[in-house]
């Protein structure tokens, strides 16, 4: 079996997250679940593997839907500019805080220091 290679590409992260959220909102039931994007007007360009980031965010949403245990379940994805890139935060209002997560998206592509960084995203 061949290992898939990461496809790192320059991406304006606020636009990407906004489009990601809009594409998924149609799958939620009104009054039961809601996904919201909190992005800025500032253009923040990062080097990411879009497919990997999409999978990580979808996994966080799936876990919230399975274990949130609250109605209405409100999920938020927020983008912050940080030194050297952007931080993508995910949170929900469900029971417990273990489903919350942060992903670092670097401004410049570089050599990975660890296997986790090879995908172009880091889960904190």
Language-model segment annotations:
Residues 2-6, 45-48:
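Conserved micro-motifs of the catalytic ATP-binding
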Residues 34-44:
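Conserved catalytic submotifs in the C-terminal HATPase_c
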Residues 53-54:
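A residue-level detector for a conserved hydrophobic packing site
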Residues 74-84:
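Short beta-strand/loop element within the Bergerat-fold HATPase_c
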